[in-house]
């Protein structure tokens, strides 16, 4: 009798035989060595082998399959990254070739466009456009909502030597070595040391009025320093006297981000100006009558030098006829009224509008140093005049120095600091007593007379026509009586389009050729 389970067992045997028949074929496909494959590219073999393995051998190890897939995927990813890097490299090389083909002006224009497209916050504009303003960076603010600029913002069309503060109210000169900051520190540090270490002792042992007087002199000296360092010394407007027929005007039109059209005029002086632009015009200061004058020293001087009066010259850099006693400062690149000198310790010119403050500044500095010197000596020697209790604590000068070391430091500082301001004050007292400027004294009085300036009797050709022949009157004019005047450049007024006073024009041709 046949068992019921016989057909089932036969079926199992058939399945087993079928599996054994398929397995070698599968093994042949999955165990082929890549080096012995008929394919030339192993990467192509791997990409074809994966679907065949999945279809024929579902019983393969999952770990083997995952490793095989990850190897293929990583190879594909590496190839894609390399292609992407090559594309980026090609794009960069193409951009470099395009940039090299551009001229310098186009590159600068591209940089300006990038800056204009950049949105600037209100705080950034407030700090860099009002609190501290450099006219050379005005292109950074072309995308502001308001198109009205101040004169100080457009000065020289981005080639200004000044930095403005508080909306054009104050200014200073851009310099590589800010010596004025060192000067300010030399004024502030001694006062701070005095306040910290000596003020309370002198308030108790001397008198409060002594402390108050020193603090007043110290504070007013700092005020005069800021006044001198940041005020207008008497700048004159530029480009007032230009030969119109020699001016070439070109208009550049640009469109801003606010869809507004900005017109900017470019000026250039072509050719050589007339000869009168390079002559020195002398205005006579004295009229003499040879028949009525005796052969005195004054009459000889007047007759010999009556033509050497007030000289008026043309400034080829500022393009203006300079008034009398006006000179061009190479540091400020401005013509200054009644120009005395350019002070590197204040980083500003000394002229008509701040010369009086300069004189009082020197006086206050000398008084402050002298006052500090005296009270420091009194504090160090106070033990000799003190009460019995204090004299028992401090009995010698060495003990006093150990007790008050800052007083000794301030004493030494005062002795050193009073030297230069004291000599400078004495020199300017002499100049103001003659009503003459430093520039006139060094150029015409101090230097040796030449044949062109010597009248034959050993006297110099320069005659100070501004001298009132009264020392007290000259001192009063310079220290108290002279008016500071008003600013002639109006930096805080609104800028009007096409105002040639604030344009950047090259010096006249004859000046550049010589």
Swiss-Prot record:
Reaction(s) catalysed (UniProt annotation): L-cysteinyl-[protein] + hexadecanoyl-CoA = S-hexadecanoyl-L-cysteinyl-[protein] + CoA
Coiled coil: none
Record text on subunit structure and interactions: Interacts with ERF4.
Segments forming domain DHHC: 313-363
Cytoplasmic side: 1-176, 227-356, 431-514
Gene Ontology molecular functions: protein-cysteine S-palmitoyltransferase activity
Region (Disordered): 1-94
Protein EC: 2.3.1.225
Domain characteristics, as noted in the entry: The DHHC domain is required for palmitoyltransferase activity.
Its job: The ERF2-ERF4 complex is a palmitoyltransferase specific for Ras proteins.
Name of the protein in its database record: Palmitoyltransferase ERF2
Residues at the catalytic site: 343
Record-stated family: Belongs to the DHHC palmitoyltransferase family. ERF2/ZDHHC9 subfamily.
InterPro entries cross-referenced by the UniProt entry: Palmitoyltrfase_DHHC, PFA4/ZDH16/20/ERF2-like
Entry keywords, A to Z: Acyltransferase, Endoplasmic reticulum, Lipoprotein, Membrane, Palmitate, Transferase, Transmembrane, Transmembrane helix
The keyword Metal-binding is annotated on this UniProt entry: no
């Amino acid at each position: 009798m046949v068992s019921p389970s016989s057909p089932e067992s036969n079926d199992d045997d058939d399945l087993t035989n079928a599996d054994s028949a398929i397995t070698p074929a599968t093994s042949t496909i999955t165990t082929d060595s890549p080096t012995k494959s008929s394919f030339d590219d192993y990467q192509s073999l791997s990409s074809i082998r994966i679907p065949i393995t999945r279809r024929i051998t579902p019983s393969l190890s999952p770990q083997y399959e995952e490793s095989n897939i990850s190897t293929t995927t990583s190879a594909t990813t590496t190839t894609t990254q390399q292609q992407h890097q090559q594309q980026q490299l090609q794009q960069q090389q193409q951009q470099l070739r395009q940039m090299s083909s551009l001229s310098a002006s186009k590159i600068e224009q591209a940089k300006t466009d990038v800056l204009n497209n950049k949105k600037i916050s209100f705080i950034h504009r407030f700090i860099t456009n009002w609190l501290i303003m450099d006219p050379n960076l005005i292109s950074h603010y072309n995308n502001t909502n308001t198109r009205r600029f101040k004169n100080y913002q457009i000065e020289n069309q981005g080639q200004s030597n000044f930095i403005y503060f508080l909306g054009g109210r104050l200014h200073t000169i851009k310099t590589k070595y800010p010596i004025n900051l060192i000067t300010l520190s030399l004024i502030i540090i001694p006062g701070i040391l005095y306040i910290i270490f000596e003020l309370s002792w002198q308030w108790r042992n001397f008198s409060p009025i002594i402390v108050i007087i020193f603090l007043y002199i110290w504070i007013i000296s700092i005020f005069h320093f800021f006044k001198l360092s940041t005020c207008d010394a008497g700048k004159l407007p530029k480009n007032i006297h230009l030969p119109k027929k020699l001016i070439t005007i070109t208009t550049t039109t640009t469109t801003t981000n606010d869809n507004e059209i900005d017109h900017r005029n470019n000026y250039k002086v072509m050719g050589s100006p007339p000869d009168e632009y390079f002559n020195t015009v002398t205005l006579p200061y004295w009229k003499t009558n040879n028949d009525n004058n005796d052969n005195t020293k004054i009459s000889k001087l007047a007759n010999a030098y009556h033509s050497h009066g007030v000289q008026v010259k043309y400034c080829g850099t500022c393009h203006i006829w300079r008034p009398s006693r006006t000179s061009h400062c190479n540091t400020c690149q401005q013509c200054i009224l009644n120009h005395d000198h350019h002070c590197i310790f204040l980083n500003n010119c000394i002229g008509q509008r701040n010369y009086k403050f300069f004189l009082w500044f020197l006086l206050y500095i000398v008084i402050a140093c002298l006052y500090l010197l005296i009270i420091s000596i009194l504090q160090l020697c106070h033990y000799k005049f003190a009460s019995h209790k204090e004299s028992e604590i401090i009995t010698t000068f060495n003990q006093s120095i150990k007790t008050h070391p800052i007083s000794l430091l301030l004493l030494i500082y005062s002795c050193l600091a009073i030297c230069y301001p004291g000599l400078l004050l004495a020199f300017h007292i002499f100049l103001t007593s003659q009503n003459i400027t430093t520039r006139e004294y060094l150029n015409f009085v101090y230097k040796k007379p030449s044949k062109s300036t010597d009248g034959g009797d050993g006297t110099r050709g320069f005659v100070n026509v501004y001298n009132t022949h009264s020392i007290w009157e000259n001192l009063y004019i310079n220290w108290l009586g002279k008016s500071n005047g008003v600013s002639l450049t109006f930096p805080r007024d609104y800028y009007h389009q096409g105002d040639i006073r604030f344009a950047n024009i090259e010096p006249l041709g004859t000046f550049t050729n010589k």
